[in-house]
């Protein structure tokens, strides 16, 4: 699912849960969407961290 649509659906279900409550199916969908979102974010962070190179700092004497 497109990230924008994923976030929109998560937000919709959150607002609905506060206003009128969710059905059991919607609660399950909400959990799955939140897990998918978290997995995407974790994957993005992992890719960014793998691309980071450590730059050695020169020894400094004070």
From Swiss-Prot:
Residue intervals passing through the bilayer: none
Main localization (coarse): cytoplasm
One GO cellular component, as annotated: cytoplasm
Keyword Cytoplasm: yes
Keywords associated with the record: Cytoplasm
InterPro entries the UniProt entry points to: DUF896 (IPR009242)
Keyword Cytoplasm appears in the UniProt entry: yes
Annotated compartments: Cytoplasm
Pfam family, any one: DUF896
Family indicated by similarity: Belongs to the UPF0291 family.
Protein name, as recorded: UPF0291 protein CLK_1994
Source organism: Clostridium botulinum (strain Loch Maree / Type A3)
Lineage: Bacteria, Bacillati, Bacillota, Clostridia, Eubacteriales
């Amino acid at each position: 699912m497109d990230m924008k649509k994923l976030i929109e659906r998560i937000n919709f279900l959150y607002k609905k849960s506060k206003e009128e409550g969710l059905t059991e199916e919607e609660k399950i969908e909400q959990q799955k969407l939140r897990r998918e979102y978290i997995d995407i974010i974790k994957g993005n962070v992992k890719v960014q961290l793998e691309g980071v190179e450590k730059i050695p700092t020169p020894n400094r004497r004070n």
